[in-house]
């Protein structure tokens, strides 16, 4: 996960200084056909993450990232995440959790081994994305993070570079509206998207932290429930 921080710092100059707060609604106001901005439908799998800062509701994508979703669900159902803190909070970037010892080093998958990445052009690091943390290629365990960068905070230069690199027009447009961290695409596995409670994630990202970006006051995951929408 240290690679995330280095990459973000390198690209921070490409982010505009405008914005930084979440609109009054807890949902992104994005007009897009990209699946991450759809509301849950019957048959979809969702997770409710209860924290002492509020509830974050996430739409999961088991068809696209089956191992990441299955790992997350099984760990949640086994109570693994109960009582675990958000051990990293970086304003306008991300919040991270999933380490049993409250550090960036702890954690393991349901298989007790690291598992491979599941990249897809259907899922991207828009604001509100839920993604697996790792320390290199195919090193996924139990840690995850939410993207909480500036809403609509991508510079024209960044968007132009994405166009030059032949990113899909729909993805570029979604990033333009929602903001996010496109530099993390194809490096970390996205497997979910916040559809309610985005402001809770942003509140966590703005807490006071120490020199290691660890919140000075613990922000705790109380429980995670997973269910199928009826």
Segments the model singles out, each with a brief description of its role:
Residues 2-21:
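Sec-dependent N-terminal signal peptides of Gram-positive bacterial secreted proteins and lipoproteins
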Residues 18-230:
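Cyclophilin-like peptidyl-prolyl cis-trans isomerases
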């Amino acid at each position: 996960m240290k690679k995330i921080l280095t990459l973000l710092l390198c690209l921070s100059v490409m982010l505009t200084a405008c914005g930084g707060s979440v609109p009054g609604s807890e949902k992104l106001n994005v007009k897009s056909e990209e699946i991450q901005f759809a509301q849950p439908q019957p048959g979809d799998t969702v997770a409710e993450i209860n924290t002492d800062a509020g509830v974050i509701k996430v739409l999961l994508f088991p068809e696209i990232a089956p191992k990441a979703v299955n790992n997350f669900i099984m760990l949640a159902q086994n109570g693994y995440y109960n009582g675990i803190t958000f051990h990293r909070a970086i304003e306008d970037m991300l919040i991270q959790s999933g380490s049993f010892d409250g550090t960036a080093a702890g954690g393991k998958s349901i298989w007790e081994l690291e598992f491979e990445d599941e990249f897809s052009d259907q899922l991207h690091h828009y604001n509100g994305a839920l993604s697996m943390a790792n320390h290199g290629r195919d090193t996924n365990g139990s840690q995850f993070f939410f993207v909480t960068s500036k809403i609509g905070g991508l510079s024209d230069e960044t968007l132009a570079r994405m166009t030059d690199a032949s990113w899909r027009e729909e993805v570029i447009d979604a990033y333009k509206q929602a903001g996010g961290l496109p530099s993390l695409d194809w490096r970390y596995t996205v497997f979910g998207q916040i559809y309610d409670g985005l402001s809770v994630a942003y509140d966590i990202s703005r807490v006071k932290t120490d020199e290691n970006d660890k919140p000075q006051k613990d922000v705790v995951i109380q429980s995670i429930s997973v269910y199928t929408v009826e």
